Design a protein with these regions (language model features):
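Regulatory and interdomain segments flanking nucleotide-handling catalytic cores
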Residues: 1-648
């Protein structure tokens, strides 16, 4: 009987060794340098190892994984119901039943004996060492007992893998007088110089591939790409940096395997995406860029309930295989659709000429060919999105992605629950940290700040959803605009808000100038979420409304400055507000009233006159509006309507 004809019951009887391959310290590997080309190359290299080299090795041992075929057939199906109807059949056609999943730097599969498992683990570790130096991979296997359930084995192997990771990894000491450090990372020994470039590259065997060696064109392209990076300042680089440059170049020129998110987005945009951008290309206004880091919520609780819903091993194994594909598809599909929609609306306004061998590529008329500056997709897969966007699109992209991802995962859970007597009460959402920072901010600092904001958003989700038992959860988003100090302590900075605006209730989080973190599905229109925080959509719409009316942000600053002035009484602030309003146009006053309902609030009160209790509740998100005012684009359709109404 062929492997395809076997049932999951057969697979579990014959294969009692579970294997886990896990790439660890991924963020350290990707963000070891601040050069965008190397970060891009590191990300693509990890995708290449996970989607090409690991399946290649598994195929040698009879385990087939046709990821390219799977993606082409079902990742672009628009209708969720159709996708979910076809996913089981397509997975069984393209993925060996012994493979639980391969993706997001990890792999989990079953084999018949421990010797085979150890051979595979050894070979995978060796290919990582050869092709992705400094990448950290843990490969472990677990022999299941005769009557041990697959979910128990998964938990046991996870514990074994965690123990292995806790042992750490050997570190090379390069802090020695004679050691020459890599000029790009500063953390590895330099082994490649401009003077001896070709010899040095040959010595580190950079032209090797998993199945042999690169062809002459690939060798030439690699040498040229590395030369272009190091020749300007005659720098010396490490093997790791050289490999990252190689794979950054490979992603642009030689993506024959069509792996990773770039292969999806460039097709969606009809190849109008610049693949060799610099960080400055994403700058908006006073050199600000947007950094987005989103991560799935509730996966742990969701998967705990899977064991209660799918009580047989066969059902459980089948579901887990499907779940990993659906999670990855929804992440990539939604991000693609969000970007495509914004692209079609003309929101990506910047274009950049294409270079080849240092020269501009020309069209038939002799003019430079330009492509759109869209984004740098550093991590997209599983439930993670880590990307750089133009600063005036980052918050809106994140919101739209989180909202649509949440809707897709909710739909999936509903359809699964309809099939089963026992229901999974959890739903998977996404929480995100968005950093708006200067383009000179080191990338690792952007990542660290994004992670802190993401954790803040997740904490708010936990806090607000813990009392929503049996109700649909929603994700959250936190954001921060950072000036020249990329390493600012956001938590300490925000304490000033508590101390300044809410001395009596500082532990309750009522800031009265900010409502961060915001929910994705808020309480404004949806009764299902009436007990959660205000949504980020409301804030975005407020800013767009102000910008459509050409409301000056200097007047928003006046209101904010008045809010933070604790030398004035409540009545004095109201009087000064009236004075500020008297200098505004009727249209400006109308928009303030529409957004904050000031008409019925600007009343003097002579009770407790010396206590600033009333005014602090006015404009309770004014700092959020002020901070992102320059980082939300005005909708073109709204602008055109305003122009038509004004007779322009």
């Amino acid at each position: 009987m062929s492997e395809k004809d076997k049932t999951f019951e057969d697979v579990l009887k014959e294969n009692r060794v579970l294997v886990s391959i896990e790439t660890v310290k991924i963020k350290d590997f990707i963000f070891s340098t601040n050069k965008l080309k190397l970060i891009r190359g590191a990300s693509y290299l990890l995708d290449y190892m996970n989607q090409v080299e690991v399946p290649r090795i598994l195929k040698k041992y009879g385990l087939e994984y046709k990821t390219h075929e799977l993606v082409n057939k079902i990742y672009n199906i628009n209708d969720d119901k159709e996708f979910l109807e076809k996913v089981d059949e397509e997975i069984d056609k393209t993925i060996d039943k012994r493979i639980l999943y391969i993706g997001a730097g990890n792999a989990k599969f079953l084999v018949e004996d421990k010797d085979k498992a150890e051979e595979i683990c050894k070979e995978i570790k060796e290919v990582y060492k050869t092709l992705a130096p400094s990448a950290k991979v843990v490969a472990e296997c677990y022999q299941m007992n005769e009557n041990e359930k697959i979910w128990t084995a998964i938990d046991e192997l996870a514990q074994k893998t965690a123990e292995k990771k806790s042992e750490g990894f050997p570190m090379l000491n390069i802090d020695l007088p004679f050691a020459v450090k890599c000029d790009l990372s500063g953390t590895e020994p330099a082994v490649v110089s401009f003077k001896n470039l070709e010899k040095d590259l040959k010595k580190i065997e950079i032209h090797k591939s998993g199945e042999g060696s690169d062809d002459d064109k690939q060798v030439k392209d690699t040498i040229t790409a590395i030369r272009n990076v190091i020749k300007k300042d005659n720098i010396k680089i490490s093997e790791e940096s050289a490999v990252k440059i190689k794979y950054s170049n490979k992603m642009i020129k030689d993506d024959v395997n069509e792996i990773g998110f770039y292969s999806i987005i460039k097709k969606a945009l009809s190849y109008d995406i610049h693949l060799n951008t610099e960080i400055d290309d994403y700058s908006v206004g006073d050199s600000f860029i947007g950094f987005v880091y989103s991560d799935g919520d509730g996966l742990g609780d969701f998967l705990k309930n899977v064991k209660k819903v799918y009580t047989t091993e066969e059902e459980y194994l089948k579901f887990m295989r499907k779940f990993s594909v659906i999670l990855d598809r929804n992440t990539k599909y939604v991000l693609k659709e969000v970007i495509k929609e914004m692209y079609e609306k003309g929101k990506f306004v910047k274009k950049k000429p294409i270079l080849k061998d240092g020269k501009f590529v020309k069209d038939e008329k002799g003019e430079n060919i330009e492509k759109s500056v869209i984004g740098e997709f550093l991590i997209v897969g599983g439930d993670d999105v880590c990307a750089v966007f133009p600063a005036d699109l980052a918050i809106e992209i994140s919101y739209e992605f989180q909202k649509q991802f949440e809707e897709k995962m909710k739909k999936f859970t509903e359809i699964e629950n309809q099939k089963n007597e026992k229901k999974n009460p959890e739903n998977i959402t996404s929480s995100c940290g968005v950093v708006i920072a200067k383009n000179k901010t080191p990338m690792f600092q952007l990542f660290e700040q994004g992670l802190k904001l993401q954790k803040s958003a997740k904490a708010k989700r936990y806090q607000e959803n813990k009392n929503r038992e049996g109700k649909v959860r929603t994700g959250y988003i936190d954001f921060q605009v950072i000036g020249n100090e990329g390493n600012v302590n956001i938590k300490e900075y925000r304490k000033k808000w508590y101390n300044k605006f809410d001395k009596e209730d500082k532990n309750k989080g009522k800031l009265h100038v900010s409502r961060r973190p915001y929910s994705i599905s808020g309480s404004e229109k949806n009764k299902e979420y009436k007990d959660v925080s205000e949504s980020i959509k409301k804030l975005i719409d407020q800013v767009k409304k102000l910008k459509t009316k050409n409301f000056p942000n200097t007047k928003i600053r006046y209101i904010y400055d008045l809010k933070k002035d604790d030398t004035k009484t409540d009545n004095e602030k109201i009087m000064e507000s009236i004075n500020i309003l008297s200098k505004m146009s009727t249209e400006e006053i109308q928009v303030l009233n529409e957004l904050w309902g000031i008409k019925d609030k600007m009343n003097l009160s002579f009770e407790n006159e010396n206590k600033n209790e009333k005014f602090k509740e006015f404009f309770d998100n004014i700092f959020d509006v002020l901070e992102i005012y320059d980082f939300i684009q005005k909708d073109k359709s709204s602008s055109e309507k305003e122009d038509n109404n004004s007779g322009n």
